Curated annotation (Swiss-Prot):
GO terms for cellular component: cytosolic large ribosomal subunit. The gene is rplA. InterPro entries: Ribosom_uL1_bac-type, Ribosomal_uL1, Ribosomal_uL1-like, Ribosomal_uL1/biogenesis, Ribosomal_uL1_3-a/b-sand, Ribosomal_uL1_CS. This is Large ribosomal subunit protein uL1. Gene3D superfamilies: 3.30.190.20, 3.40.50.790.
Length: 229
């Protein structure tokens, strides 16, 4: 078993793992223990009351956080004609069709999000084995296959996050950076939880959002008291 660093020992000593903290107190703890030499991300884990073995209970979607994520996403768009011009005007970093597909096949993947218009999926479909494992395959459920590519680009650039539950029914995503204000982080978390509640499967019974925990890139998780949100 790996030895705990002095930092992790200090964090564990300062966080009561049996307690759910009021959101502002939880964020204050994250900031207190964020001592890395870079600006750490603030991540969230949301335990959902679903059975992830059942396909009709899996949760997947996207939402735009009111204060963004603290990083600028590079966006690649598969489209053509007027849509290509609209995508460029909206701030897309890469726009193309077969030419863009060839770049990706060569391993040139300098982007974080891939968007496609429906007519471009015949080209994108050839890249499933490359984009799929990286979570980059366009999907209409998260708004990355769309007729309105310009809006999708703007959303991606303005702090949209994509989420899906893992095999344990937990959503893992980021809600900003540790240098965000407490208000910004709280409002971003509220936006995520509102989106998740809207995406609740009709077949899911009982309590849907069972537990919410926040952490920094290098820190321990802090459970959040949901009534404080």
């Amino acid at each position: 078993m790996a030895k705990l660093t002095k930092k992790m020992k200090a964090i564990k000593a300062g966080v009561d793992s049996t307690k759910a903290y009021e959101i502002n107190e939880a964020i204050a703890l994250l900031k207190q223990f964020a001592t890395a030499k870079f600006v750490e991300s603030v991540d969230v884990a949301v335990n959902l009351g679903i059975d992830p073995r059942k396909s009709d209970q899996n949760v997947r979607g996207a939402t735009v956080l009111p204060h963004g994520t603290g990083r600028s996403a590079r966006v690649a768009v598969f489209t053509q004609g007027a849509n290509a011009e609209a995508a460029k005007a909206a701030g897309a970093d890469l726009v193309g069709m077969e030419d863009l597909a060839e770049q990706i096949k060569k391993g040139e993947m300098n982007f974080d999000v891939v968007i496609a218009s429906p007519d471009a999926m015949r080209v994108v479909g050839q890249l499933g084995q490359v984009l799929g494992p990286r979570g980059l395959m366009p999907n209409p459920k998260v708004g990355t296959v769309t007729l309105n590519v310009a809006e999708a680009v703007k959303n991606a650039k303005s702090g949209q996050i994509r989420y899906r539950n893992d095999k344990n029914g937990i959503i893992h995503t980021t809600i900003g950076k540790v240098d965000f204000s407490e208000v910004q982080l709280k409002e971003n978390l509220q936006a995520l939880l509102a989106a998740l509640n809207k995406a609740k499967p009709t077949t899911a019974k009982g309590i849907f959002i069972k537990k919410v925990s926040v952490s920094t890139t290098m820190g321990a998780g802090v459970a959040v008291e949901q009534t404080s949100l």
